[in-house]
């Protein structure tokens, strides 16, 4: 790749440097790659920006209603080359077998899909009817799979705070494997309960909704994950921790959490999140760091991906504008996988078994009257009804 303006996320610089790729990895990154050119070398001349492939630090494929292969096909043209997925929705239905199916299909893709073993399936025991309940033995088994990067979001934060034996056993199995424990602290209480949660093992958290949340997570040694998904708009309210309070941006990560397929088609994926962070006042190179090297470092993969540097996986984006991020070309593991917004590679599927299909069983057929709330007799003008409140652009859990 000759003549490009390289975004160096290690030094936070733009450098007029060349890039040489061999066997799917960066072989040379520097001012003159001409000596790397042989008779069979493919040369790409590009005067625009050359940036690392984007990473989604926390997300659930199932929210899109797509399989991992189809999700990859949707997001690759938007520049996403690495995803850290928590398949806790399929775990609710199929348990460990379902997680393994998602894990296996993820490993087949032309981009990097790492799986976090779900920790809390079901997420609300006793309040939902599920097909399976994840246990500590399941977590210990999954930690041996090649694509497992850690433990998925620890949603049972009261269990962590109060020393629930199952939650502690799941985190212990993850720690023994030397992998990352994902967090989910969905409470405004930043006092003793939060301190206990941070001490329990979770290394990150994406449930923050305001500047104080982001600041406290970083101060307690956690990575603050700021999300922009289809329903989550939590970047703007937290990014002031960087842009105004001046906290070290290397401890912040961008993610989506949940994206509907319509969002992917109409608005994009991680390129949308980076654009949004920049529009909220973040320096473009800082925003890129939060969607590349910061994420890789958090999961122990800094020497493997997340930057354009020698030895790393050759995941690259060509873009003509560092703020708007139009994605002109996407390279993953040294091969062009998307060009001008269209995918140019295959995203293979596993052979999904019959057990993974038609899994919704409603029992007795329901009628509309069963969902009606009858008004009390006797001319009462006021009745108490249990409802679910709505918070605009948030979904506190």
Regions found by a protein language model. Give the residues of each.
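Divalent metal-coordination and catalytic microenvironments
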Residues: 4, 24, 47, 58, ...
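Active-site mouth loops of central-metabolism enzymes
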Residues: 55-67, 123-135, 203, 207
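Active-site beta-loop-alpha junctions enriched in small/polar residues
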Residues: 60-62, 88-90, 118-123, 153-157, ...
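Histidine/acidic residue-rich metal-binding segments in metalloenzymes
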Residues: 132-153, 159-226, 233-254, 265-279, ...
